[in-house]
Amino acid sequence: MTENRKDLTLVFEQVSDAELWALAEFVKRATWSEFRANAVDDDEAYRISDGVAKLQKALEEAGYSPR
């Protein structure tokens, strides 16, 4: 995979409040073992982890921050 960085803005127009809370809970609970089990190698697992962390931060900034 080439390292071409692209900015992406996601707009959740048809996602319910309950679905966003569930997504926030999921990304909070997801662990390295899930990332690694679904990746072809450690490098991809780290990229998955980084992407999930960014999604979690965006959800937190939007008010979806489960304890």
Residue ranges and their predicted role:
Residues M1-R67:
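Positively charged, low-complexity terminal tracts
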